[in-house]
Structures are given as C-alpha cells and as structure tokens.
C-alpha cells in the first residue's frame, strides 16, 4: 500500500466519519461495523481517530491478517487493540443473522459498495438496514463512481480520464495488462508487477457500475431515512462523444457520501 492510500484510509476516511457523526452518535460508546474492512487499516484508523468503543471489521477476504505487517514502519503497534475484531464473511452471508447478538450502532462502508456483485446489492443493503439497531446509522461512501473520469479504478496504470468508457473492452484489457512500470511500481519485481496488473483487471471487471442516484434508491428502498448526502465533482471535462450518450452529471460526479438512519 502506497503512502497516499495509507493516509486516505488511516486518516482521511476516519476523520470524515467523525465529522459526519458529530452530534449524532457518541462514538466512544458505540459499536461500529466496518463493512468491507479489507486490510483493516481503516478500521484501526476509526479506533484511533474516533475512539469508538468497539470496532468489528468484516470482509469476504482475510487481508486483515496482514494488518500488523501493513502498518509496520508507519505506526507503533506491536499488537492490535483489544476492541478491534475481524470476521470473515461469505458474499451472500446474512449480516443480521451473523450479528444477531450484537447491538450495532452504525455500519461504516468506504469505497466498498462499487465492488459488491450486482445481484447481491439489494441483499447487502437490506442486511445492513436489518443489522443496525433502531435509531442507528449507515454511513456509505463510494469514490470513484464508475462513470466518472477515473471510475475504472485504473488511474495508477492508465491516467487518461474516461478511457474505460471510450475504449473497446479487449483493447482496454490489453492496455492494463501491457502497462509499463511507472514510479509507483518501480521497485516491484517484473513477476509481481504482472500479478498486480492481473489483480487490477479483476477489480475493473467486477465493478458493478452503480451510480450515485442508484445507491440512494437502493438504501431508501430498505426503509432507511436519508439524513445527509454530499457529492463531489471531477475537475475534468467529459468528451462530447460521452455527453452525447450519458448524462453529464453521471460523468462528472466522482464521489457520493451519504448518511442514513433507521427508525
């Protein structure tokens, strides 16, 4: 994980969450579930910056097992905090059953929902709504959104905006798999860099293409109430060949952050 990504996960996202929850939830007395915790860096950041009472990180992978290795040389931890727990879940696992004995005050999800399989999106949203307690919250963020300038998530290999929408699919795959090392990957072995590119392609191929409005509709459809939303725009100007096909707002909205509350 490069330093910019680490900073975004450990510092930026947890601090943004703390700001949004100010005056709404006493985080020091709350149990937070990090949906899509991955390496656990963000979960650790939530504990450090938000002082949450308890943090449960869940994901379909077990990358959290490398958390101490990931933070080595960056943070001074020899062991993980006792109030930080991780659990591996299956993609279609019902959260509400898994955590039936827990009181979940808020579910936090940062740059995760664009990776949920399309056919599981309604179930995932519904289970989040069922899992949080009455009066609890769901904090959901996506960036970059698929149709935005770098919604491909491939900008570290292909820096041209909207290239994933203007390039034939097999040609775009070739661009990814044949990309040359840049300064970010200069120290990677050739063998490892090839694996990195293959993993990048897998990420792109499994993006669900959800839009900001679709995300709102998805969660509002569960019965949750929208408390607040915030959208950010790209500074890039979409080409006319795309604005002739897509709504400009869909092309330029790169991030949505929304906070929902359960009755």
Language model: regions and residue ranges:
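Class I SAM-dependent methyltransferase Rossmann-like catalytic core
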Residues: 1-25
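Acceptor-substrate binding/catalytic loop of class I
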Residues: 198-212
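A short glycine-rich, Lys/Arg-flanked "PGG" loop and its adjoining helix->strand segment in the class I
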Residues: 122-134
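Conserved class I S-adenosyl-L-methionine
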Residues: 137-180
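Conserved glycine-rich SAM-binding loop
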Residues: 38
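A conserved beta-strand element that flanks and buttresses the S-adenosyl-L-methionine
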Residues: 108
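C-terminal lobe and adjacent flexible extensions of AdoMet/dcAdoMet transferase-like proteins
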Residues: 214, 218-263
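Class I SAM-dependent methyltransferase SAM/SAH-binding core
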Residues: 41, 45-96
């Amino acid at each position: 994980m490069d330093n910019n990504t680490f900073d975004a996960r450990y510092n930026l996202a947890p601090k943004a969450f703390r700001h949004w929850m100010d005056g709404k939830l006493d985080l020091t007395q709350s149990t937070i579930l990090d949906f899509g915790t991955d390496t656990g860096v963000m979960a650790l950041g939530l504990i450090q910056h938000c002082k949450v009472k308890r943090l449960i990180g869940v994901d379909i992978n077990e990358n959290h097992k490398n958390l101490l290795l990931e933070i080595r040389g960056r943070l001074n931890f020899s062991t993980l905090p006792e109030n930080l727990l991780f659990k591996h879940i299956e993609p279609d696992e019902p959260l509400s059953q898994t955590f039936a004995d827990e009181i979940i005050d808020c579910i936090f999800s940062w740059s995760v929902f664009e990776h949920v399989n399309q056919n599981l999106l309604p179930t995932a949203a519904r289970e989040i709504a069922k899992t949080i307690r009455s009066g609890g919250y769901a904090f959901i963020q996506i960036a970059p959104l698929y149709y935005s300038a770098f919604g491909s998530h491939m900008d570290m290999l292909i820096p041209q905006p909207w290239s994933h929408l203007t390039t034939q699919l097999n040609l775009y795959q070739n661009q990814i798999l044949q990309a040359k090392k840049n300064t970010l990957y200069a120290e990677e072995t050739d063998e490892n860099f090839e694996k990195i590119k293959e993993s990048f392609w897998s990420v792109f191929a499994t993006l669900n293409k959800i839009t900001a409005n679709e995300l709102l509709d998805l969660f509002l459809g569960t019965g949750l109430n929208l408390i607040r939303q915030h959208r950010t725009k790209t500074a890039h100007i979409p080409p006319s060949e795309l604005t002739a096909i897509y709504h400009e707002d869909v092309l330029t909205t790169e991030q949505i952050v929304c906070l929902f509350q359960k009755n």
